[in-house]
Regions:
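ABC ATPase nucleotide-binding domain helical subdomain, centered on the C-loop/LSGGQ "ABC signature"
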Residues: 76, 136-138, 171-208, 252-253, ...
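C-terminal portion of ABC ATPase nucleotide-binding domains
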Residues: 78, 253, 275-315
Length: 315
């Protein structure tokens, strides 16, 4: 814009433009144009800033409301998990699987496995009610989706395959503000010896996201926290993926003891412990098969092949 003013204004001063300007007239016009151009650009930026502020305010306004009092969470007790005709998937897409029926009792460990992207983790998250599911999930006759978030918090414990750790100490990460001694749970996940060898022991800070721990240590610490809070329904999504077979076998024995009052859903692609599970869910090609390990080996060739392939691996 300034270049055009200089060009055409110069022609007017020289008498070859559409009119004749004096130097004073040209200088005045150029100064006014510069001022207006500067103010106009600031006005555009101000308009954009106001528009962004309005959008941001709409987003945060619900968060500015008074938070309702959080009721005390009681873990309670669950005797029976019933799943009927369960369908899971992402909204708008073909379901990952459908027709899952399962009945499990307190003290049982249920394995979930299948090929990649068959819906194992999606099934685990269905117990959190993060997205709608078809069919029914009932705990002692109560539909999970109809419970309040606080009630579900007291009933369901979830451990994802990416451990979520806080930047506090090992003790704080296990107890989450509760009192007590976390060593029994650290012992159950074979982490007690490593913690004892640390200079600050239980007061060792793990760093944001557990960056000061190895992958296996972070995974075991998150599992210790899940076991410490003893929810009636435990969802463990691939909790042994960063561990060797010997450590996994030892932790599984402790899991049986510490989770004796819970129903455990164990999601894993490693099957050598599955013969010890009470039931197994096999997900593949949109279908769900449920049975004991022996039953699935006999009637599901893909499950049998995957188990045989892993059985030959050395620990």
């Amino acid at each position: 814009g300034a270049a055009l003013i200089l060009y055409f204004g110069g022609k007017n001063v020289l008498g070859t433009g559409w009119t004749v300007w004096s130097i004073a007239e040209f200088t005045t016009f150029l100064a006014c144009f510069t001022k207006l151009a500067t103010k106009s650009s600031k006005a555009a930026k101000l308009f954009n800033a106001v528009h962004k502020a309005q959008v941001s305010w709409k987003r945060i306004q619900p968060l500015m409301r008074e938070i309702p009092a959080v009721p005390a969470v009681s873990a309670g007790r669950v005797e029976r998990l019933e799943i009927r005709d369960l369908t899971c998937g992402y909204p708008g897409d073909t379901p990952l699987f459908s027709g899952l029926d399962l009945t499990a009792c307190r003290g049982q460990i249920i394995g979930v496995t299948g090929p990649v992207a068959c819906g194992k983790s999606t099934l685990g998250k269905a117990f959190l009610c993060e997205q709608p599911y078809g069919g029914s999930i009932r705990l002692d006759g109560r539909e999970l989706a109809e419970l309040s978030p606080w009630e579900r918090t007291g009933l369901v414990g979830y451990l994802g395959h990416d451990p979520e750790l806080f930047s506090g100490t090992i003790r704080e990460n296990v107890l989450l503000g509760d009192t007590g001694d976390p060593m029994d749970y650290l012992r159950a996940v074979c982490l007690d010896g490593e913690v004892a060898a640390m200079t600050e022991g239980l007061e060792t800070r793990v760093g944001t996201g557990g960056v000061r721990l190895s992958g296996g240590q972070a995974q075991r610490l998150a599992l210790a926290r899940t076991l410490a809070h003893q929810r009636p329904l435990l969802i463990l999504d691939d909790p042994f993926s960063a561990l060797d077979r010997a450590t996994e076998t030892e932790i599984f024995a402790h899991l049986r003891r510490l989770a004796a009052d819970s129903v455990v859903i164990l999601i894993s692609h490693r099957l050598y412990l599955f013969p010890e599970l009470d039931q197994v869910i096999w997900l593949e090609n949109g279908e769900a098969k449920v049975g004991t390990h022996e039953e699935l080996v006999g009637n599901t060739p893909d499950y049998a092949a995957q188990f045989d392939a892993q059985r030959g691996e050395q620990p």
